[in-house]
UniProtKB/Swiss-Prot annotation:
Keywords: Amino-acid biosynthesis, Aromatic amino acid biosynthesis, Isomerase, Tryptophan biosynthesis. It comes from Rhodopseudomonas palustris (strain BisB5). Belongs to the TrpF family. Its EC number is 5.3.1.24. This is N-(5'-phosphoribosyl)anthranilate isomerase. Coiled coil: none annotated. One of its GO terms (molecular function) is phosphoribosylanthranilate isomerase activity. PANTHER family: N-(5'-PHOSPHORIBOSYL)ANTHRANILATE ISOMERASE.
Amino acid sequence: MSVVVKICGLSTCDTLEAAVAAGADMVGFVFFPASPRHVGLDVARELSDQVGSRAAKVALTVDASDALIRDIVEILKPDLLQLHGSESPERVRALKQAFGLPVMKAIAVATAADLAMLPAYAETADRILFDARPPKDATRPGGLGMTFDWELLRDLDLSLPFMVSGGVNPGNVAAALRVTGAGGVDVSSGVERAPGAKDPELIRSFIRAARASEELMT
């Protein structure tokens, strides 16, 4: 089984190069000022040029306006839109139609009740990302290093490809994939030495661990 590996929250040329050179399938860029991983449009343009076609580019937004997404699409030229806020299934459909791009919708998970909206999102999104539900007082919806109970996803009956995130790191990524049966994994804080500061060696270690898990899942 081939695992899709996404390194999210990249903001510098050297860490982006580390991710691409190590074989990341997707590289994510955060457009959300409250995040320490936020990048402006000028930086996004530079990073987009650096990636070229070597990896799929993912634009992460949180309840963003059409105008902002339009600017991001024009400059980053993403392959995938990642909606990490409270966007409804109808909003997912509208953005797909407006920009002609596939959408990955993030679902915040703490209990089984959080999966209730899956059928509705499965009708509109192209991919689902399961992330840990943040505390009520959190200022951002992800990248907090929190995990959730992966057993909630075991034997999940979902017609869409899905990825798992939330507190994954080089030491636990194999377990996350094994328990959830996810076809992909998304990491941000798990490859950082400080919030927003990606570590090239941790990036390489994470990708090696994810690739090693493929052999165990075949």
